[in-house]
Amino acid sequence: MARTVPPQLETDPPVTGETSDGLCSASATRNRVVLPSLPESHRTIPFSSGASWFRKVLAFAGPGYLVAVGYMDPGNWATDIGGGSKFGYTLLSVVLISNLMAMFLQALSAKLGIATGRDLAQACREHYSRRTGLFLWVVCEIAIAACDLAEVLGSAVALKLLFGLPLLAGVLITALDVLIVLALQGRGFRFVEAFVVTLIASIATCFGYEIFFAHPLWREAAIGFIPRAEILRNREMLYIAIGILGATVMPHNLYLHSSIVQTRAFGSSTRDRREAVRYAIFDSTLALGFALFINAAILVLGAAAFHTRGLHDVAEIADAYKLLSPVLGASLASTLFACALLASGQNSTLTGTLAGQIVMEGFLDIRLKPWLRRLITRSIAIIPAALVIGFAGENKVTSLLILSQVILSFQLPFAVIPLIQFTNSRSKMGEFANSRLTTVVAWFVAAAILFFNAELLWLIFRSASVLNEVVSSLCLSAG
């Protein structure tokens, strides 16, 4: 498919020099024509402003679900199961707050992509110095590698549980998902979205079955959604809580969302873009609502199946698999758990591969053939995962899954702060710039992320046991 160039967007007249908000030559460069990320899919899905409300919703349905995949990946499973089995329903409030933060940040990401015709990576490359841009690219690649590590390991664990395959063989098999991405995207971006939505539906069905047989204490679960100060005081609880935050609010999803909303062929007028922003936010909020249900279901399952039965140390995914059927008295419970894990891993690796392509093209402006781009981004995940299993052994998989989510949490400020800075900039966004209330909420979210990260660092360096665990896992993952 020939590459398309985004239409000229209606923006304020170009102004040269540095802007008042510190963006280097932002207004001077925002009208410069650049090739879009994912050029083979750019503006390929029709969107008519004259269609009915339902047809508009359907036209924009899809990007939000690709984003939601990252909020229910195998990294979430490790943190949610560990949190549920050890602390019961207490950490449900963290799941809720994390998902609300994710909904807010993804709305800003979608607005950036639609209003400017740039994804977040392209905006960073244009408006920061080359050195800063390269730093942000490296940080983002680390985040993607950590996320992909969790996804690849999750898929490998599922294959082992279902078919008895060694973990290393499972990791190598996951490399084949590159072919799935190529085959689906070759038929159109709608096929990618349909594939992802189908897998999400299968995950939700599996957990609906598990929850039905787990018989949760619904009153205690409802109370669990109320935040408690105990979470900040308890070292282990805070460690898992920040892992949940890192597993829920994914840095690379902010880059992904700002790009894939541009697969819709909305008009270039201010009115058309405003309408597109509205439907894009509706799509992502609804999709992340499903992600909230699945994340909460995993933690509730851990609490109902294990914590209430005195099993407080079920942190390994494999242990959860072995215990589910006998504990719940349902023969299919363990099998469905593994099937959902496999679906989650495949879904996440697919979107992670797309995010890797977007980040590479956006930050470095490197245009490679689709198969080569995806082979490179897949290798970034496959190689570390193979090294981890080869040198660390299979018994450290879940601890590394949790650690990967904590690493993701540390990467968040480097994606969130540029996103807020850009969407606050009237010279870049025009009348789409954040309102005063949105700006206050955005910086509050950023401050909360920084606070939790600083608190975790303090706890890690104050506690030798946690420090040794983290350093040991890092050394193992490095081989």
Enumerate the predicted regions with their spans.
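Flexible loop linkers connecting adjacent transmembrane helices
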Residues: 39-45, 79-84, 107-132, 157, ...
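Extracellular loop-to-transmembrane helix junctions
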Residues: 55, 82-107, 121-125, 132, ...
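Juxtamembrane transmembrane-helix boundary signature
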Residues: 67, 94-127, 136-142, 347
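Extracellular/periplasmic helix-exit of transmembrane alpha-helices
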Residues: 102-115, 261-269, 289-319
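Loop-to-transmembrane helix boundary motifs in multi-pass membrane proteins
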Residues: 130-133, 168-171, 286, 334, ...
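Transmembrane alpha-helical segments of multi-pass small-molecule transport proteins
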Residues: 137-141, 162-184, 202, 206, ...
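Hydrophobic alpha-helical segments and their helix-loop junctions in multi-pass secondary transporters
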Residues: 178, 200-229, 238-241, 245-259, ...
